[in-house]
């Protein structure tokens, strides 16, 4: 079964512009055309497009995705290189996750402080303005 660009975008949760761009830069191999010369996609294309979305969300650049695709098209013998690329992306994601967790800790701490101030449990202080009471 073949799907239109619009259907493929919906299935892959991707914008029409992004899908068209990925096609134009050669990131989606083996795309067929219908009798009106419109691109049509099969299940294999859609699964690959979903993989591209994941790689993009990992922070992989277009150039890196093109290199990954090239390795994929060479077959099983390139699995070690692909594993290495994915390991690097995983490392980057773990670092990002750690940064996000630190940011969440900061926000939780600030929210707790603000709640304590609003409840009259602690006195408000600021690093930015002078909050000392002048007599």
List each language-model region with its residue ranges:
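C-terminal regulatory/oligomerization modules of transcriptional regulators
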Residues: 76-135
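Basic helix-turn-helix/winged-helix DNA-binding cores
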Residues: 1-70
């Amino acid at each position: 079964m073949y799907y239109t660009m619009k259907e493929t975008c919906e299935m892959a949760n991707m914008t029409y512009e992004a899908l068209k761009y990925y096609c134009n830069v050669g990131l989606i191999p083996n795309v067929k055309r219908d009798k009106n010369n419109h691109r049509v996609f099969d299940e294999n294309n859609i699964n690959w497009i979903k993989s591209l979305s994941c790689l993009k969300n990992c922070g992989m650049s277009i150039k890196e995705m093109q290199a990954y695709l090239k390795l994929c098209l060479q077959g099983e013998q390139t699995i070690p290189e692909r594993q290495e690329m994915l390991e690097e992306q995983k490392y980057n994601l773990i670092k990002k996750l750690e940064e996000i967790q630190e940011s969440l800790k900061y926000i939780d701490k600030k929210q707790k402080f603000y709640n304590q101030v609003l409840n009259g449990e602690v006195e408000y202080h600021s690093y930015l303005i002078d909050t000392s009471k002048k007599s």
